[in-house]
């Protein structure tokens, strides 16, 4: 990838991080194939079906056992829709 594309994908990951409801940490991830196609995205948050109320997100004892990393959510999303991530690159706004 070129620096121009790397910058575009990390900027997109920063935008996606704003979708997180976590009041203290916002992380985004964009997973990209070799031909610069976006295969999946994710942000830190609770898994589907788990109540993500502000009260729960502000309680560390409840939050940390449940919350998923942005890259973890991107991988789960790709698996759910049947998209291969083989040989892809993940652009993440914060190290795992």
Kindly label every feature range from the protein language model.
Residues 1-96:
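Zinc-dependent deaminase catalytic domain
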